[in-house]
Amino acid sequence: MYKAIYMSPMIPSFDLQITGIFFKDILNFEKVFDSGNYTIYEKNNLTVHILPAGENIGQMEFYLEVDDVDTFWDTIKDKILGLKVREPFNQDYGMREVHIEIPKTKTLLFIGQAVS
């Protein structure tokens, strides 16, 4: 049997540069690979792969769990003007979340933490 290390999302983008700026400048990921039409960003041993989107791509969703969603929100709220966002709120299933549409993609990013 093998040991799974982690799973990385592959996000199709209509503009790799703008999507990359979101991960670098807002979420503080570091670009670790760039072939011109395929990039990889990394933070705390998590990676996100960004590639060119095809014409008929469907909606995607990813969940990023953080230690403090309110501190995360305070860090990014002034950097995300113009993006589709839902500010921090509590879900019935015990998570406090922020929702952000990743620029130039059809991807919704959930950022959350467990609440007691």
What are these regions (language model features)?
Residues 16, 63-108, 115:
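Vicinal oxygen chelate
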Residues 24-25, 42, 77:
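Alpha-helical segments within the soluble intracellular
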